């Protein structure tokens, strides 16, 4: 690999990198504190669209992670930015929670089930047959189909949960329409994050625990990529992919001396 510029800004995934099964990853609180005191720009990225940045800040704080709201970038925020760029002041029928609805309201979108420009699907713990049926009919009537992220499952203390990608597949099967996924591994998620902190890809590193989203997304956006072994992907699994991260480390604790 060619020599890269020293890392001046950091993007890091949340689940599996900073927290795991409701607990902080060892070294993660120190890692966040080191990034904050260094003055280097950083963002915590998540494909989870359920929570607002304020909600996530509070949840992370309870685990000893001091992450300010402005340092969180979610697929919900990226979706809001994408829609505002595509069709300013548009309308959307939304299946999702406060993180997504707040992000769309913040960019001036009107949420409606009457002839919306878009059907926007995000994460929720209360998917209803009625809401999914309405989404199918609106898409059949011409609404464009957007989904915050392609993850088919998500983590919980009890085990895997169906995620937005699974519900999107069901809606696609019923309509014959594939959604446009905004979140990771779409490199647009990375580019929007970089723009948010005025960072450049050549001097930014992406830390993640998943080869199929975090590392792929970082590679396609031109970032240095760092795989940690505290989440989904193992060293053995990483070897099976046709692409490789810039490096593999045990956890973010191994990066403390670099910040």
Residue ranges of each PLM-predicted region?
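Asp-based, Mg2+/Mn2+-dependent phosphohydrolase catalytic module
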Residues: 2-40, 49-73, 77-259
């Amino acid at each position: 690999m060619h020599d890269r510029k020293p890392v001046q800004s950091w993007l890091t995934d949340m689940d599996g990198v900073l927290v795991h099964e409701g607990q902080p990853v060892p070294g993660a609180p120190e890692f966040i504190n080191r990034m904050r005191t260094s003055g280097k720009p950083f963002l915590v990225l998540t494909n989870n669209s359920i929570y607002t940045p304020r909600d996530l800040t509070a949840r992370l704080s309870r685990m000893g992670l001091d992450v300010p709201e402005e340092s969180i970038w979610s697929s919900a925020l990226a979706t809001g930015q994408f829609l505002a760029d595509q069709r300013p002041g548009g309308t959307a029928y939304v299946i999702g929670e406060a993180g997504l609805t707040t992000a769309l309201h913040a960019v001036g979108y009107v949420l409606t089930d009457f002839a919306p420009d878009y059907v926007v699907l995000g994460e929720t713990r209360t998917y209803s047959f009625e809401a999914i049926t309405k989404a199918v009919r609106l898409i059949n009537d011409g609404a464009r189909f957007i989904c915050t992220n392609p993850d088919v499952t998500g983590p919980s203390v009890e085990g895997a949960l169906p995620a937005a990608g699974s519900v999107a597949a069901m809606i696609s099967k019923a309509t014959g329409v594939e959604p446009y996924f905004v979140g990771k591994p779409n490199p647009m998620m990375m580019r929007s994050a970089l723009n948010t902190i005025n960072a450049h890809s050549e001097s930014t590193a992406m830390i993640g625990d998943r080869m199929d989203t975090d590392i792929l997304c970082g590679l396609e956006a031109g970032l240095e990529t760092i795989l940690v072994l505290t989440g989904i992907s193992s060293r053995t699994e990483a070897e099976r992919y046709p692409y490789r991260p810039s490096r593999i480390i045990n956890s973010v604790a191994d990066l403390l001396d670099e910040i």
